[in-house]
Design a protein with these regions (language model features):
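N-terminal lobe of the biotin/lipoate ligase/transferase fold
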Residues: 1-89, 156, 231
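Long, positively charged amphipathic alpha-helical accessory segments at protein N-termini or as interdomain linkers
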Residues: 65-70, 74-94, 104-243
């Protein structure tokens, strides 16, 4: 598997840069990293807070062949698993909060914005814009629960080393996707889900409730079971975690 890397000092958004690149390199994986993003995006209207040179910021593009639109969430699972696997070598207590955040206990260490292009019934390409909090010691935005590797371990970590670990892990999980091993990737994802056991607090348009995680469906919807035994299915942003 071939990977083409582009390194930038400063950019508005690595996702935007990669999406508008005129001539895409002929590689299985194309990735752009930046020391600083002036408009790094999170989900919706959110912005990813990052002190210059302190964190890992990258966008990764793949052009998979044969991944059906109905199973496109497997790509999100694979990338999230790769980020977690890299961080697993540096600390413990990590899990994946649906849909693709990496959590250390109840705090967010990494998040990803995904942009997918479709061609007919299949995925044409997919861009993962990821931020991983590495060496930042203080967060000033109103983000509710950020944490960095530096805050966890008490020491600085080489950012390029973390990046190499992510790419190495991604190659393994992405190879599973290309081989059609969607259920295998999904099983690995479910095994490390945040709140995968027990009853926890959530809220939706009808108010707050207690529920347990049942599964994440192929289409990426989260399935919860409330105290009455009723299954509730949610797309992203339709349910909130009460942390």
């Amino acid at each position: 598997m071939t990977t083409y890397k582009i390194r930038l000092d400063d950019v508005d958004s690595t996702n935007t840069y990669l999406r508008h690149l005129e001539h895409l390199p002929d590689a299985d994986v194309v990735v752009v990293t930046a020391c600083h993003q002036t408009a790094g995006r999170g989900m919706g209207s959110n912005r990813w807070e990052s002190e210059d040179g302190k964190n890992l910021l990258f966008s990764l593009m793949v052009r998979p062949e044969g991944v059906p639109v109905a199973r496109q969430f497997v790509l999100s699972m694979a990338e999230a698993l790769a980020v977690k696997a890299a961080l697993d070598t540096l600390t413990d207590g990590l899990s994946l909060k649906w849909p693709n955040d990496v959590y250390w206990h109840d705090r967010k260490i990494s998040g990803t914005l995904i942009e997918t292009s479709i061609s007919g019934k299949f995925v044409k390409d997919c861009i993962f814009g990821t931020g991983v909090n590495i060496n930042q010691q203080e967060f000033r935005s109103d983000a509710p629960n950020p944490v960095s590797l530096r805050q966890i371990t008490g020491r600085d970590t080489d950012i390029d080393m973390v990046f190499d670990k992510v790419l190495e892990a991604f190659e393994g999980y992405y190879s599973m996707v290309l081989a059609g091993e969607y259920d295998r990737v999904a099983a690995l994802y479910h095994d490390v889900l945040y709140r995968r056991t027990g009853m926890h607090a959530y809220s939706d348009g009808d108010g707050q409730f207690m529920a347990s995680v049942v599964r994440v469906d192929h289409d990426g919807r989260l399935v919860l079971r409330d105290e009455a035994g009723r299954e509730r299915k949610y797309a992203f942003k339709e349910v909130n975690y009460i942390i």
